[in-house]
């Protein structure tokens, strides 16, 4: 191929200075000193580096020239004129043959190279365009600088040309015709499959706890059917409260078995040494010191009394009274017979209308007698017969 020959032609001038340098460093065949040998090697190294950079610049120049020729040919095929800044450059670079070995090697892809993807090709062409524009501005500073805008304009022309070649006839046919009204909507498609189940939602706020206040009672329901009789329960204890409520309105007092001298032991002659046998506390009240019996409820009362007396000092009779509020209500008098014993009893009773807070008592009339307070012979009591008759 032509490429290796060019490489040999370029590398031959580099070999001659290397031989001349080696002869100069030898100093007519004499052995060189260590310092001069190092300087010669350093010089040869820089010279080789400069030559390699020149070769690289030349290769880039040739590649840029071939690329510009291809773009110029594409513009001529599209029928567009070149930019003013690139006309002189393209004419000056037109002397190189695009079919030369170096141009074909640098500008065209090798047959073994695999085609790139569309995105990769666009990136590669953009990087090549930027590199080529920089080289053109470097080698031709007198002409109008190339910019990326011109390269984009060229690429847009290429794309528009290719699109016009593919869709041009169809678009030309449609020119001049008005678009018709849109057609009716098509039938709806079949429903798609159900989507996946979504995540569970956030739990709600717990409710306020209710109150335990009891509501108003409802209306009474209808009575149910009568149930069977139950078993007989055990006998209960007597109800003291019921017994007390049903207790009869009576009081009975009796003596405590003592012997009393009226003159020495009684104050005012009223008997007070009583022992309660029965008494309804809701109707009667006993005053132990004074010996008086107080009535708590208005009504009609039956009052009775008996006293056993012992005669002394030749007294031939005995007498006592039943007083109500210190006023005589009943009186009993008994005389002694000649040749009889000195003991004797006297009994009296009567019915009286009494008001609440009135007091009953037994009062001795004569002071020269003694009283035998035996529980069987001396007693005093009252019975409430009922309400007082209306007057």
UniProtKB/Swiss-Prot annotation:
Query: What does the tissue specificity note say?
Result: Not abundant; expressed in specific cell types of ectodermal (but not mesodermal) origin of keratinocytes, hair follicles, sweat glands. Also in adult heart, liver, muscle, pancreas, prostate, fetal liver, uterus, small intestine and umbilical cord.
Q: Where is this protein localized, as stated in its record?
A: Cell membrane
The annotated regions of Low complexity compositional bias extend over 86-101
Which biological process annotations from GO are given for this protein? animal organ development; canonical Wnt signaling pathway; cell differentiation; cell-matrix adhesion; cytokine-mediated signaling pathway; gene expression; hair follicle placode formation; immune response
Start and end residues of each THD domain: 249-385
Cite the residue spans of the region called Disordered.
Answer: 73-127, 146-245
Where the record annotates domain Collagen-like, the positions are 180-229
Task: Locate the site labelled Cleavage.
Answer: 159-160
Describe what happens upon changing residue 155 to C: In XHED; abolishes proteolytic processing
Effect ascribed to mutating residue 338 to M: In STHAGX1 and XHED; likely pathogenic; decreased function in positive regulation of canonical NF-kappaB signal transduction
What name goes with this protein? Answer: Ectodysplasin-A
């Amino acid at each position: 191929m032509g490429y290796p020959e060019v490489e040999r032609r370029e590398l031959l001038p580099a070999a001659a200075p290397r031989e001349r340098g080696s002869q100069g460093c030898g100093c007519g065949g004499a052995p060189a000193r260590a310092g001069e040998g190092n300087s010669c090697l350093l010089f040869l190294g820089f010279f080789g580096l400069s030559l390699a950079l020149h070769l690289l610049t030349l290769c880039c120049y040739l590649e840029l020239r071939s690329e510009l020729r291809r773009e110029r040919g594409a513009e001529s095929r599209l029928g567009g004129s070149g930019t003013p800044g690139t006309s002189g450059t393209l004419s000056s670079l037109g002397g190189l043959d695009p079919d030369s070995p170096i141009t074909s090697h640098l500008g065209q892809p090798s047959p073994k190279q695999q085609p790139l993807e569309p995105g990769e090709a666009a990136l590669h062409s953009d990087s090549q365009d930027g590199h080529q524009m920089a080289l053109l501005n470097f080698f031709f500073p007198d002409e109008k600088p190339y910019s990326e805008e011109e390269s984009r304009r060229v690429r847009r022309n290429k794309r528009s040309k290719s699109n016009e070649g593919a869709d041009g006839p169809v678009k030309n046919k449609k020119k001049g015709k008005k678009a018709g009204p849109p057609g009716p909507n098509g039938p709806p498609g079949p429903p798609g499959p159900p989507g996946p189940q979504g995540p569970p939602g956030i739990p709600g706020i717990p409710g306020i706890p209710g109150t335990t206040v009891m509501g108003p009672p409802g209306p009474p329901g209808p009575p149910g059917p009568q149930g069977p009789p139950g078993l007989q329960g055990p006998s209960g204890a007597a109800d003291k409260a019921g017994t007390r409520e049903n207790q009869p309105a009576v009081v009975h007092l009796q003596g405590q078995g003592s012997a009393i001298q009226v003159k020495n032991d009684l104050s005012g002659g009223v008997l007070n040494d009583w022992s309660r046998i029965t008494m309804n506390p809701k109707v009667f009240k006993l005053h132990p010191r004074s010996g008086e019996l107080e009535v708590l409820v208005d009504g009609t009362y039956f009052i009775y009394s008996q006293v056993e007396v012992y005669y002394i000092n030749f007294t031939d009779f005995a007498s006592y009274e039943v007083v109500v509020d210190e006023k005589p209500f009943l009186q009993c008098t008994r005389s002694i017979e000649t040749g009889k014993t000195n003991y004797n009893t006297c009994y009296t009773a009567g019915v009286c209308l009494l008001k609440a807070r009135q007091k009953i008592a037994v009062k001795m009339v004569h002071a020269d007698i003694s009283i035998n307070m035996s529980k069987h012979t001396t007693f005093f009591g009252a019975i409430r017969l009922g309400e007082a008759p209306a007057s």
